[in-house]
């Protein structure tokens, strides 16, 4: 699409035998032309959920949800939070010759062998809603709609779930629980949301600390006070929950132990990690190498269903989910910071509202 104000384009290049798709957007500014490029490695294969950073309650909940024969599973977060990558992994788990998986995407970022992928083309009348309506006549078992942007698409997704399809899609919301009032705002009846939603993922991306040059340190009293406030460590049960997560991670042999980083349930945190001041050759002197996800997965339990029908607030629903075992994105980020996989600063950067 081109006009006087902006230009967007896409093309492919090959570097050292690997093919990359580039999406380029330019905008005229006072100093010239501002360009943003999104680079997609077409040789990338879907990562496992564990490789993406799912574990514990989040992993168990989403693995159970995707085995349901019908319903809606949503992935939420801002632009650039890894939603498409999560969807790619989820669809790849389910992909087999025994099921018909069809998608409507804008654009098709990663091609999945054996999956029928359709690209949105507004000029040709192929919108998300129009594409979804067409897919329903193609006898699909599993449907993925790139994004629910309007009431029509939301309604069609719910109706598809009611008629025996497993539907995946995304929403731009701050966390998992706020996806529910967003659907209500789109005009979906509470009882329909309660009966079709299976699980809602909230996620963010954080930079991964370089394992070669990261530095362990003991937080000062002032820093500990700030961390305690930001992560609500002074609230009843929070430190106890961190110790429970440490025991669970140790039993499942997940990541580095956080036991050494934790004091007693009363004393708080003993050890944290930060990026090396000048980085190293392994991370191009940045202190960080790659990115990883932090997640929360809200299960639509019977109690949550009743709250949806009763028009409960997203805060109340979030608290109910946490009481049932869900760990918030902040807690997941904190655990990964205690393991030395990311930093406290990174977790706060992406989870502060």
Predicted stretch roles:
Residues 1-353:
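Short, flexible helix-loop junctions that flank or precede catalytic/ligand sites
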């Amino acid at each position: 699409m081109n006009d006087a104000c902006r230009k967007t384009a896409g093309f492919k290049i090959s570097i050292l035998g690997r093919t990359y798709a580039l999406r380029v957007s330019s905008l005229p500014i006072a100093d010239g032309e501002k360009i943003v490029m999104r680079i997609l490695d077409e040789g990338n294969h879907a990562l496992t959920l564990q490789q993406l950073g799912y574990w514990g309650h989040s992993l168990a909940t989403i693995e159970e949800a995707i085995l349901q024969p019908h319903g809606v599973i949503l992935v939420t977060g801002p632009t650039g939070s890894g939603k498409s990558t999560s969807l790619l992994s989820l669809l790849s788990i389910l992909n087999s010759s025994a099921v018909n998986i069809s998608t409507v995407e804008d654009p098709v970022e990663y091609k999945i062998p054996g999956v029928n992928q359709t690209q949105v083309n507004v000029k040709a009348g192929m919108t998300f809603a129009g594409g979804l309506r067409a897919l329903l006549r193609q006898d699909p078992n599993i449907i993925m709609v790139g994004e629910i942007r309007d009431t029509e698409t939301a309604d069609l997704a719910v109706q598809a779930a009611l008629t025996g399809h497993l539907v995946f899609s995304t929403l731009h919301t701050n966390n998992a629980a706020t996806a529910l009032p967003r659907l209500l705002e789109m005009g979906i009846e509470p009882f329909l949301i309660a009966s079709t939603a299976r699980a809602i993922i909230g996620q963010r991306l954080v930079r991964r600390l370089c394992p070669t040059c990261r530095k362990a340190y003991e937080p000062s009293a002032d820093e500990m006070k700030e961390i305690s406030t930001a992560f609500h460590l002074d609230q009843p049960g929070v430190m106890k929950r961190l110790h429970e997560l440490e025991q669970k991670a140790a039993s499942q042999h997940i990541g580095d132990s956080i036991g050494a980083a934790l004091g007693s349930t009363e004393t708080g945190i003993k050890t944290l990690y930060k990026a090396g001041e000048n980085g190293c050759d392994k991370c191009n002197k940045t202190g960080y190498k790659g990115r990883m996800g932090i997640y929360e997965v809200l299960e639509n339990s019977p109690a949550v269903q009743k709250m949806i029908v009763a028009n409960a607030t997203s805060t109340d629903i979030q608290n109910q989910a946490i009481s049932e075992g869900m760990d918030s994105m902040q807690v997941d980020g904190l655990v990964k910071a205690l393991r030395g996989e990311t930093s406290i600063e990174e977790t706060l950067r992406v989870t502060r509202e």
